[in-house]
């Protein structure tokens, strides 16, 4: 979309390290995703080796979501994810986990929540994180009965609203895994 290009093109022009590929809605081209996203517009950040870390934003990153998007770019460029070694080890020893973070652009705490969930996906192939901007995708808000944001969905079966810190998210995921195993 033109609105997405308005956000992304200045970033691409600002650094030769950023390359942008666009997927048109009716295209069979994957634009580097490795798959065709189920919702467009979508942004996947892929590292310089072409590796997809399982992080995608559905919608146009504006306001607070733009800050989270910029932090994703910094995470990719520096490799810094703000998780200590013990936490990374625990994340890598978990079952595969899919995180969906549902946000609106200007709601406080959404960008921090996105950054934490993204850091889990960045440091482990066992975690994916999709972020959906609900103003652009009201059908997703309806499907998950979202009344407040941020709302995080873990593997489609655990849904909780509000922000969290890194250790709290890890605890929630570990408890969900142990509940499923029992």
Question: What is each stretch, according to the model?
Answer:
Residues 1-14, 91-125:
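Local sequence-structure signature of Cys/Sec-based thiol-disulfide redox active-site neighborhoods
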Residues 29-53, 143-155:
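Structural micro-motif
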Residues 23, 102-104, 132, 155:
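Generic beta-strand/beta-sheet core signal
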Residues 15-28, 125-139:
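Thiol-based oxidoreductase modules, predominantly thioredoxin-like and allied folds used
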Residues 79-92:
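Long, charged amphipathic helices and adjacent flexible linkers at domain junctions
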Residues 27, 47, 89-91, 182:
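Feature detects long, helix-prone N-terminal segments enriched in hydrophobes
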Residues 45-80, 153-182:
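Non-catalytic, surface beta->alpha helical segment in thiol-disulfide oxidoreductase systems
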Residues 1-31, 40-42:
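Oxidative protein folding and maturation machinery
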């Amino acid at each position: 979309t033109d609105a997405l290009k308005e956000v992304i093109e200045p970033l691409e022009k600002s650094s030769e390290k950023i390359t942008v590929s666009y997927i048109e809605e009716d295209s069979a081209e994957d634009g580097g995703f490795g798959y065709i996203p189920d919702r467009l517009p979508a942004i996947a950040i892929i590292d310089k080796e072409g590796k997809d870390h399982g992080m995608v934003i559905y919608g146009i990153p504006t306001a607070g979501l733009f800050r989270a998007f910029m932090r994703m770019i910094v995470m990719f460029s520096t490799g810094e994810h703000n998780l200590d070694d013990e936490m990374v080890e625990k994340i890598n020893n978990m079952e595969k986990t899919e995180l969906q973070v549902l946000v609106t652009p200007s709601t406080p705490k959404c960008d921090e929540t996105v950054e934490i969930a993204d850091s889990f996906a960045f440091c482990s192939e066992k975690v994916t994180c999709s972020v959906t901007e609900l103003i652009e995708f009201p059908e997703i808000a309806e499907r998950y009965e979202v009344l407040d944001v941020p709302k995080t969905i873990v593997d489609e079966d655990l849904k909780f609203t509000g922000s969290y810190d890194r250790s709290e998210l890890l605890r929630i995921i570990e408890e969900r895994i142990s509940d499923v195993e029992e």
